[in-house]
Amino acid sequence: MTDPAPAVTGKPLRWLQLDGLVLLASALILFAATHQPWWLVPAVILLPDLFMLGYLRGTQVGAAVYNLGHAYPLPAAMSLAGAVWHHPLTLALGLLWLAHIGMDRLARYGLKYDVSFQHTHLGGPHPKETDARLPSDRAA
């Protein structure tokens, strides 16, 4: 298992949240350009969370599967494939997948460590200040 690093806090966290907001907004603007129906947004925006099912096999498998669905490479490749092959639905679905990731980052949900679902590179949705301290900083 991997020991989680301290949670990102302060200005770096705000920059990472801004990254998420920019990704979310950009993906939705590009989605609009695909001329796909807007009902797709609520229909599929949460589908990447199905990658949480990996946790049924334990925290190590769960973190790996979850991170596979919540990192940029797969949805970026899907979006690129849709654009290159002139397949608007594939492009739209890839963009909505990226929008989901942006939404998660904005809400402070990050990539998972394999110690538990709550330990992320962003410290979870509401990290406590004590989570941000290094183990050596904690009183013994």
Where is each model-derived feature located?
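N-terminal membrane-targeting hydrophobic helices
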Residues: 1-140
